[in-house]
Curated annotation (Swiss-Prot):
Keyword ATP-binding: no
Function noted in UniProt: Dehydratase; part of the gene cluster that mediates the biosynthesis of iso-A82775C, a enylepoxycyclohexane and biosynthetic precursor of the chloropestolide anticancer natural products. Within the cluster, the prenyltransferase iacE prenylates siccayne to generate pestalodiol E, using dimethylallyl diphosphate (DMAPP) as cosubstrate. The probable oxidoreductase iacF is then involved in the epoxidation of pestalodiol F to pestalodiol F, which is further converted to pestalofone A by the short-chain dehydrogenase/reductase iacG.
Enzyme class, broadest EC rank: oxidoreductase
Protein name, as recorded: Dehydratase iacD
EC number, as in UniProt: 1.-.-.-
Species the sequence originates in: Pestalotiopsis fici (strain W106-1 / CGMCC3.15140)
Residues covered by the EthD domain: 18-113
Length: 138
């Protein structure tokens, strides 16, 4: 029997205009994360990671990207939240959990959810720990 692929569900989030990057990260890390993670675990989230973007590096890199890939855009989001699940139903279950709603009660003070983007798919690893893997031989 083929092994089921784990689904990767990612969300790009932006802080609300007027909220400093420092205050946003402080709130996210020290207030929101401790409230969210236990509820995620309860709702079968297999793995959760946060990708914090660096606006200074992103802005500088955009000028380099423009030279080699005109039209490509370096994301301006503040956070990319990465969730791994066996079934997207677990994401839906999480979103309907009253504890989840309670954890997110202040999110509109801090985040501009009108700019959020969702990505759904699978990870396939081709280099891990410096070693090539999963590449068909010629």
């Amino acid at each position: 029997m083929a092994q089921q692929k784990v689904i990767k569900y990612t969300v790009e989030h932006n802080r609300k205009d007027g909220v400093s990057e420092e205050d946003f990260i402080e709130w996210f890390t020290n207030t929101l994360i401790p409230q969210m993670v236990p509820v995620m675990q309860k709702n079968n989230i297999l793995k959760y990671a946060v990708h914090k973007t660096d606006h200074q590096i992103s802005t500088a890199f955009q000028s380099q990207v423009d030279k080699v890939r005109p039209g490509w855009v370096v994301s301006k989001c503040d956070l990319i939240l990465e969730h791994w699940v066996n079934d997207l139903g677990d994401i839906m279950k999480l979103s309907q959990d009253p504890e989840w709603a309670a954890a997110l009660k202040d999110q509109d003070v801090w985040m501009d959810n009108s700019k959020s983007n969702i990505h759904i798919g699978y990870d396939t690893i081709y280099i891990e720990d410096g070693t090539i893997t999963n590449v068909p031989r010629k």
